[in-house]
From Swiss-Prot:
This precursor was synthesized in a cell-free system directed by mRNA isolated from myeloma polysomes. InterPro entries: Ig-like_dom (IPR007110), Ig-like_dom_sf (IPR036179), Ig-like_fold (IPR013783), Ig_sub (IPR003599), Ig_V-set (IPR013106), IgV_Light_Chain (IPR050150). Residues 1-22 form the signal peptide. Keywords: Adaptive immunity, Bence-Jones protein, Disulfide bond, Immunity, Immunoglobulin, Signal. It comes from Mus musculus (Mouse). Residues 120-129 are annotated as: Framework-4. Residues 72-78 are annotated as: Complementarity-determining-2. PROSITE patterns: IG_LIKE. One of its GO terms (biological process) is adaptive immune response. This is Immunoglobulin kappa chain variable 9-120. Residues 57-71 are annotated as: Framework-2. Residues 23-45 are annotated as: Framework-1. GO terms for cellular component: immunoglobulin complex. Residues 46-56 are annotated as: Complementarity-determining-1.
Amino acid sequence: MDMRAPAQIFGFLLLLFQGTRCDIQMTQSPSSLSASLGERVSLTCRASQDIGSSLNWLQQEPDGTIKRLIYATSSLDSGVPKRFSGSRSGSDYSLTISSLESEDFVDYYCLQYASSPWTFGGGTKLEIKR
């Protein structure tokens, strides 16, 4: 019996299944935003696949320090001011800051942890309007 055919089929199936693996893409918008002190702003991440409530919002300081603000879509981390809130509408996840303060003008990222590998949005740079 010729064993080359089963080996070729196995190889083809292996390539096929590797090719169908698709990491979850997180599309974050806007990439940058200019706003004024006291203004209300919202940032959005859209998930390419269902991630349920498995979404964090992170804040990155200029020195690289990362702080989690929101976990499980809408739960506020301990010590995070109540002006931050998270919500979901379908595959769109939002971070809202109700009244901007000077320390809020940094970078923000969403992170999905529903499926490995965990994936980040591209980030939003929040700048003060001059």
